[in-house]
Swiss-Prot record:
Annotated positions of the Phosphothreonine modification: T478
The keyword Cytoplasm appears for this protein: yes
Chain intervals for the UniProt region annotation (Disordered): 372-427
Gene: vid27
Pfam families: VID27 (PF08553), VID27_N (PF17748), VID27_PH (PF17747)
List of residues that carry Phosphoserine: S405, S415
Name of the protein: Vacuolar import and degradation protein 27
Phosphoprotein among keywords: yes
Taxonomic source organism: Schizosaccharomyces pombe (strain 972 / ATCC 24843) (Fission yeast)
Cellular compartments annotated: Cytoplasm
Entry superkingdom: Eukaryota
């Protein structure tokens, strides 16, 4: 608790600052005898000096997100800030951990037992929580004894610290009546880890009891599991504790992966959702006689709602990670809408850990519409035009399948020259036990760069369908000889340089001269600002001599200029935000507009650094791991683990119709509805052997080029390379994707610059150039058949590159 006391001079040193220490994000609650009220859902806590000697204040200040409208008619600024004189009469209580803190204190305005509580969970840098507690105790010591805290012993400070004692009875905060079923073990839900709980309940409750239904289930199991694992009979759910959120009747169908159709299992089942507490939710399908399945509500369900067919499709994974695709069909749109809100409420609360009913109607509609099987993104066309589009789409797919039937990928070849052979031999020998991890495609020099441990392989693009190993940049290291392994990579300065970051140096960027083949600079960004990610100043900046780039920390955006003396962060172009935004990725348009995504799942659109976002799009729940944007800024791609979002940023109506969301904000009820790209639950059921272990999409990308139109989106998941036709996606055909399966997981992929026909694909031990026409519609054949490899004269199929 007091391990940071020796740092007191550093913490207290700046007497010109009123603020001594701060926790930048958390929530403030008012705790009463029978309920707990959230006062500020986003807040910061700080300890400030006052003008009086030995007097300090604990200050809780509300924070606003960009795009959040403040109530102008209140006129009460005091509501946005609560301050308390740090005195022992507050009876401060602390619960401090490495990365979290909870503080409780008496409400000085009431004597009825009302308390305040400030909580920040699992998001602080190590030491911040302990520092805050120590400073608070030192302030109370100074007030009581009217002398400097430097004279205090640890025992002197401990008298002001009290532990937090929770009431034995949980407070029910305006929730529905809890429905409890009989328990075999009352503590089962609380004591088991969620993964273990999933497996145990899945084993007991997934499959049917009736003898007549066993052949069908065994047939499905044999499709997805060649070992023909024996299916055990199950009993009804005998124990489940939780709040019954709702139950809806429907038909139940199971996907047959051999026939590629859904087969009716039961004409009348009850689909129920339970709230188990602690943001855990449970989904069951049952009748009076049996329980069909029981599973946790999470993103791996891959939920798809089709209002055209009044159906809901999702995935269930058993204890052995075998995937099953199930379908519920409803008898009316009303019932389906009721079920959708029921399930989406549970899923959203699970991912966001806040109450669905506390967000506004517009945000709830935004979330639910994103999970619909899509309509058109653009203005509707007439019926005849739509019919012709469908016919054209079908004909084009058939033509592409015919073209793809005999296609073989062109894997990288090595050169004949003596010097090149030496490079190849050294590369293969030194890198034989390592695997590819990162890919960067050149815009100007027609080359691709592939990272493998502390080496970078350079591959030249040959003709339209070939790659040729050119050289290896070996033994990446600092001037002092410290080995470096890139974790993020970017080409820079007309493709003459590579900038990269390593995981163990979050405050630095390394600058490599490609021609020289050595690291020439280490750029210290800032001692107190860790670099989460970085991106070019604009879409095509790497083709120019532009020196600056854009950097992100968890809650700030700034410019990096290597020409600045000392730290490379430009102080005049640094914007820090009050709340914990948890930024994760960024991309820029041709004009330098910036799209920024976060691990919370929200997206912000900026026209420049140093201002609040023009548009803030709500989070769906999953963390965003990558973002891309078209050169014009019309469309943004945001990649999550189980789906990809396509967002049209063009404002469609009103005063700013025709402008971009980067330039003007959308009306509150007119925010763009994302198109949700994902694998269909049916295809996941057929791919399940390859997607075991929680496979994730790689960051999706548009094709790009000077004056080129973006027409295609590419990503991958596990061993499957996947592409979407952008025009078809805009017209609502989000399930119209093409795939190509490899015999190893795809590590990274991107388009060759200036074309949408050629793709560069990095596998663990190979690099290939792929013709887009080789990707095929997902069928049992295309899903189960890996790509044939063309062996080079050096027979490098299983060797590095």
């Amino acid at each position: 608790m007091f391990m940071l006391k020796s740092l007191g001079k550093y913490i207290w040193g700046n007497t010109n600052s009123t603020e001594i220490v701060q926790i930048p994000y958390g929530q403030l609650y008012s705790v009463h005898e029978n309920y707990r009220e959230c006062m500020f859902k986003d807040a910061s806590a700080s300890i400030r000096r006052t003008t009086a000697e030995f007097q300090y204040q604990l200050v809780i200040q509300r924070a606003y997100e960009e795009g959040e409208e403040e109530l102008e008619d209140d006129g009460d600024e005091a509501e946005d800030e609560q301050s308390f004189l740090l005195d022992e009469k507050l009876h401060l209580r602390f619960d401090v951990n490495k990365d979290s803190i909870t503080i409780m204190w008496d409400n000085p305005d009431f004597q009825d037992g009302t308390l305040y509580e400030f909580t920040c969970e699992n998001c602080l840098q190590e030491g911040v929580a302990y520092t805050f507690e120590m400073v608070a105790l030192q302030c109370m010591y100074e007030r009581k004894y009217r002398q400097s805290h430097e004279k205090a012993t640890l025992a002197d400070l401990e008298q002001f610290s009290n532990p937090i004692t929770r009431p034995s009875k949980e407070v029910d905060s305006l929730e529905n009546i809890v429905t409890k079923l009989d328990l075999e073990s009352e503590d089962l839900m609380r004591l088991k880890k969620q993964e273990q709980l999933d497996d145990e309940i899945a084993k007991k409750y997934l499959l049917g009891q009736q003898e007549a239904e066993e052949p069908l289930v065994q047939q499905q199991t044999s499709i997805v599991n060649p070992e023909k694992e024996e299916v055990t009979k199950t009993e009804n759910i005998k124990s489940l504790e939780g709040e019954l959120m709702g139950t809806i009747s429907a038909e139940l169908h199971l996907f047959d992966a051999v026939e590629e159709v859904f087969i009716l299992q039961d004409p009348n089942v009850e689909a129920s959702v339970f709230d188990l507490g602690d943001w855990n939710y449970w989904f069951t399908i049952s009748t009076e006689e049996k329980t069909w399945l029981s599973q946790s509500v999470d993103a791996d369900m891959n939920p798809v709602f089709s209002f055209e067919h009044l159906s809901f499709i999702w995935n269930y994974f058993d204890a052995n990670s075998n995937a099953f695709s199930w379908l519920l069909r409803f008898d009316s749109q009303v019932r389906m809408e009721q079920f959708q809100e029921l399930l989406m409420r549970a899923l959203w609360e699970s991912l966001n850990q806040q109450r669905w009913l506390k967000i506004d109607d517009e945000q709830r509609d935004y979330v639910m519409e994103t999970f619909h099987e899509d309509e058109e993104l653009e203005d509707s066309e007439d019926e005849e035009f739509a019919r012709q589009q469908l016919l054209s789409r079908k004909e084009e797919e058939e033509e592409e399948d015919e073209e793809a039937s005999d296609f073989e990928d062109s894997f990288a070849d090595f050169s004949d020259g003596e010097a090149d052979d030496l490079d190849e031999s050294r590369w293969r020998k030194e890198a034989a036990k390592e695997h590819n991890s990162l890919l960067a495609v050149g815009y100007k020099n027609d080359r691709s760069y592939v990272v493998r441990n502390n080496k970078i392989g350079v591959f030249k693009h040959v003709d339209e369908k070939g790659l040729k190993f050119q050289t290896a940049l070996n033994n990446l290291s600092t001037p002092k000889g410290k080995s470096l392994r890139p974790s993020k990579l970017m080409l820079h300065n007309q493709d003459s340089s590579i900038l990269f970051q390593t995981e163990n140096a979050p405050h630095s960027l390394y600058h490599m001269d490609i021609e020289y083949g050595k690291i020439v600079d280490e750029w210290k960004v800032h001692d107190d600002v860790p670099l989460v990610t970085f991106t070019p100043d604009n879409k095509f900046a790497q083709m120019t001599a532009e020196q600056t780039l854009i950097g992100l920390s968890n809650n700030s955006i700034f410019r990096i200029d290597p020409r600045v003396e000392g730290n490379k962060l430009v102080a005049e172009q640094f914007k820090q935000y009050a709340t914990k935004n948890d930024f994760s990725s960024a991309a820029t348009t041709e004009n330098g507009y910036i799209a920024v995504a976060s691990n919370k799942g929200d997206i912000r659109l900026f026209d420049r650094i140093g201002v609040n976002a023009k548009t803030a799009l709500p989070a769906l729940g999953e963390a965003i791991i990558g973002v891309d944007v078209t050169a014009s800024g019309d469309f943004v791609l945001a990649t999550c683990k189980t789906y990809i979002l396509l967002i049209d940023t063009r404002i469609k109506e009103g005063r700013y119709a025709g402008r971009l969301g980067f330039e003007r904000n959308f009306a509150k009820d007119k925010k763009p509805k994302p198109k949700r790209l994902q694998l269909s639950p049916q295809h996941i059921a057929m791919m399940q052997r390859e997607l075991k272990g929680g496979a994730s999409f790689t960051p999706a990308k548009f094709n790009t080029g000077i004056d080129a139109k973006e027409t295609t989106i590419v990503s991958s998941i596990g061993p499957f390379l996947i592409s979407w036709n952008l025009d078809r996606v805009k017209r609502g055909f989000t399930d119209s994707y093409k795939i190509r399966r490899y015999d190893a997981n795809v590590q990274a992929e991107d388009f060759r610059f200036g074309t949408d026909r050629s793709l560069i694909v990095a596998l663990p031990d190979d690099v290939a150039m792929v013709d887009k026409s080789s990707l095929r519609r997902p069928t049992r054949e295309s899903i189960c058949t890996p790509v044939k490899k063309l062996r080079s004269k050096h027979d490098i199929v299983n060797a590095p590159y």
